[in-house]
Amino acid sequence: MESKNTSLTNTYDIVSRFATEGTVADIRPLGNGLINDTYKVSTKEADAPDYVLQRVNTTVFTNVDMLMDNIAAVTRHIRKKLEAANVTDIDRKVLRFIAADGGKLYHREADGTVWRMMVFIPNAKTYEAVTPEYSYFAGNAFGHFEDMLVDIPEKLGEVIPDFHNMEFRMKQLREVIEKNPAGRVGEDAVKQLLDLIGKDAEEMCKAERMGREGKLPKRVCHCDTKVNNMMFDEEGHVLCVI
């Protein structure tokens, strides 16, 4: 796994690699994400936006070009949809990534670390607690996200192959059960879980079968549909999916 030690002094130099507005006043860690390191970049000027600087975990996301091409295509398409619908305050309802030196939406350091930057959305927050109310908001927001992407013209790449392929995951599970590396397969609690999964396995793999049979069209999906992957305004209304 990649080291998550990043010097705050070094982040000032990294920010300079992006086409930002204003002068950097402060850089501080932001959020508690487990995959990427995230920082808020505050600017001095009142008319300049603040930014979010993020180190991409290239152990998880090995194909950064594909990752950022996907993100660019998705955010561009959503922005066009919002503009066509005359939606107001669009910059708070879709992410805007900043180009780095060379025009790409990421910067790669000499040590191989990869960074990306987006405009910070003011007066917005995320929620960690999962309540029935916010679960409803999540379902509605992600459903709207999928609906806006149903006609995206670009073909998106599969950044982590088979990540949500249940047939592949069941194959992995069977292999681990056979090897039993931790010696726990015989435990009552583990056996109960494995029995439960076994009973539902055919239904869990149904989407893959229907896809092969041409009964289920391929669609763009978010693949990390959690409540804390959306931004809310101060009144608790959903702003955008992140």
Label every PLM stretch briefly.
Residues 46-70, 76-156:
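ATP-binding pocket architecture of kinase catalytic cores
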Residues 228-231:
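Catalytic-loop signature of eukaryotic-like protein kinases
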Residues 240-242:
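Pre-DFG segment of protein kinase catalytic domains
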